[in-house]
UniProtKB/Swiss-Prot annotation:
A divalent metal cation binds at residues 95-96, 199. One of its GO terms (cellular component) is cytoplasm. GO terms for molecular function: magnesium ion binding; RNA binding; RNA-DNA hybrid ribonuclease activity. The keyword Nuclease applies. It comes from Leuconostoc mesenteroides subsp. mesenteroides (strain ATCC 8293 / DSM 20343 / BCRC 11652 / CCM 1803 / JCM 6124 / NCDO 523 / NBRC 100496 / NCIMB 8023 / NCTC 12954 / NRRL B-1118 / 37Y). One of its GO terms (biological process) is DNA replication, removal of RNA primer. This is Ribonuclease HIII. PROSITE patterns: RNASE_H_2.
């Protein structure tokens, strides 16, 4: 079986990044990559044409098409297709924010939404949490906190910088997700959710390897599903996304007061400028920022 799709240059590079984890084959003339993934061979050409061949060619190609549940803009892969009617299940969902921001914490939240609470959560209007303004999320978060079982892991910069030499950012994410999920499971016990949905940032096997390598005593693994854009598939992830964002914003506000200057979110030029100003004032960045980011060196060069 053969399937061919056409992608833009950015998507082609993303695909090359994703497939770099698989066994490579001899790259044909005019191609950027050629790999074997399960029962499919995938070859991406500089022209933007990507050819899928083999028994699972159609399924592999579907991961990269807009109408697919799979979203692999980064090297991520769903463990399995979500079950039918998943949106109406009782689900414990988790999400994190702050991994790509220089200033502030890495914040992870987990929220349990039972079937009987689904309508209440829908009424909050959070189905697409990524489109909500910060002010709107700040109004919704207290209601989620008061009504739904939840837990938040807020890894502030100083602790983050202590852990970073030992764990890469994805491993820190995995540890935080696992810990938050475990805490919520303890809170709702003896109730067991029908499923756990993690907003995906790593391949399933890689996620669990992160936890094993970190020697986590308790690893949550039963009925766990992974998908990117998880907030689109269950309200529990949308609720978790909102909690994580609001806690991050609160932490950023407090850090800004301590620093005596508004700390911007993100990792752009404004961040470099503010970091340089803190250095001029003799302020230690480790309390405010994730030091391994390239922004640290950029700020130093601005002095």
């Amino acid at each position: 079986m053969q399937k061919v799709i056409q992608v833009n240059n950015q998507k082609l590079k993303q695909m090359a990044h994703y497939y770099s984890q698989f066994s490579s084959k001899k790259v044909p003339t005019g191609a950027l990559f050629s790999i074997s993934s399960g029962s499919a061979t995938v070859t991406g050409y500089y022209s933007g044409k990507v050819m899928f061949q083999g028994k699972t060619a159609s399924a592999e190609a579907a991961k990269w098409q807009s109408n697919s549940i799979h979203s692999l803009d980064t090297p991520k892969k769903m463990s399995t297709t979500l079950p039918a009617d998943f949106a109406n299940w009782s689900v414990l969902g988790s999400d994190e924010v702050g991994a790509g921001a220089y200033f502030g914490p890495l914040t992870t939240a987990a929220v349990y939404v039972s079937q009987e609470n689904l309508e209440w959560v829908r009424a909050l209007g959070i189905a697409d949490s990524k489109t909500l303004t910060d002010d709107r999320m700040k109004k919704i978060a207290p209601q989620i906190i008061a009504k739904l079982p939840h837990h938040v892991v807020n890894l502030m910069p100083e602790k983050y910088n202590q852990l970073q030499p030992l764990h890469n950012v994805n491993q820190m994410k995995a540890i935080s997700h696992n810990f938050a999920l475990g805490k919520v499971l303890d809170k709702i016990s003896p109730i067991t959710p029908q499923a756990i949905l993690i907003d995906q940032f790593a391949q399933q096997s890689t996620y669990f390897n992160y936890l094993k390598n970190a020697k986590q005593q308790r690893i949550i693994h039963e009925n766990v599903y992974f998908t990117t854009k998880g907030e689109q598939y269950h309200l529990s992830v949308a609720a978790a996304s909102i909690l994580a964002r609001v806690v991050e914003l609160d932490a950023m506000s407090k850090l800004s007061v301590e620093a005596g200057i508004k700390l911007p979110i993100g990792a752009g030029r404004e961040v470099d400028t503010v970091a340089a100003e803190l250095l001029r004032r003799g302020i230690d960045l480790k309390h405010y920022a994730k030091l391994h980011f390239a922004n640290t060196k950029k700020a130093e060069r601005l002095l």
